[in-house]
């Protein structure tokens, strides 16, 4: 990563992963297998952030970030579109006079369930504020596991053009840049 201005104008970069080797994660309450589906890099503006401390997915993914890119990340569009999150979903509302339509908003924003690869990344995620520019790098993953004797499954989206249940990115983050600070 260079330290020029973070370019939020481009679409996320998604590539085939060179390895599907599983990533194993053990927690106090469960154990999980992450299966890499794609390498992923997302540069954008944080439009909403929600933290979780309850349930199996909070144990492994304590933070969701709603991130916008393209024209949607430009400050002049903030007055037209508002974002919020709850219960692992993100929501947006836009004013009728918005120059960006519903399709543009869908195709240029995403709700990312963040699985931090390291404690350092976990700590950095806690500092992120709304309106900050970030670059996240890592893997989109599917998850299977056991939590308190019950089976759990969580599958990532592999497109930015879907909506509704299952349209979020399950993002195993291995590197994050917040403004000029990089964490691994």
PLM features: what roles do these ranges have?
Residues 1-184:
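OB-fold and OB-like single-stranded nucleic-acid-recognition modules
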